[in-house]
A protein has these predicted regions:
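Alpha-helical membrane insertion/targeting regions
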Residues: 2-175
């Protein structure tokens, strides 16, 4: 009896087939992720004359973020829990983890030391495995909450702050 219960409800008592349709917050986040990807792409294109001066760490950081930003709307707006969602989730998680890991080696401000933004990198390095574990355990409430937190904090807010204050993307975009 217990195994049939766990097969249907999972270890945490949440139904696998519970509604996971996107809500308003997720639609807005998907829209903003697309917008941020477009603006970042425009900035990178406008910065072409300076491409030769950019380190491989920055390029890897930008590439993995572009993948995450491109996948985010798909993950937020389509059906969840199927094999495609899981595959895209793994790609999204690996790219976000790589982005955070590489950012620890990017210390061009603050006299080569760590800055406030590096706290977000450490939180991401800890949080991505927790996000994966919550999905594997079918703790869908925690998984969805953490995914939203990453989209809002690690992508949208951090992405917004990559443009002002004489940051590279901002200087390219507004040049």
């Amino acid at each position: 009896m217990a195994s049939r219960f766990n097969d249907y409800f999972g270890k945490r008592g949440m139904r696998y087939n519970q509604p996971t349709a996107p809500d308003t917050l997720e639609r807005v986040c998907a829209f903003l992720a697309v917008g941020l990807l477009i603006v970042a792409t425009i900035a990178v294109i406008k910065g072409r004359p300076q491409w030769g001066f950019i380190s491989w760490q920055v390029w890897l950081h930008l590439a993995t973020l572009a993948v995450v930003l491109a996948i985010t709307p798909v993950m937020l707006l389509r059906k969840r829990g199927d094999s495609r969602h899981q595959l895209l989730g793994w790609i999204w998680s690996v790219c976000l983890f790589t982005t955070a890991l590489v950012s620890l080696d990017m210390r061009t401000i603050n006299n080569g030391g760590f800055s406030f933004i590096h706290i977000l990198s450490v939180v991401t390095l800890i949080g991505v495995p927790v996000l994966i574990i919550s999905a594997r355990r079918r703790d869908l409430k925690r998984h969805r909450g953490q995914a939203r937190a990453f989209v809002i904090g690690a992508l949208l807010i951090a992405g917004f702050f990559s443009f002002p204050f004489n940051r590279m993307l901002g200087s390219w975009l507004f040049s």
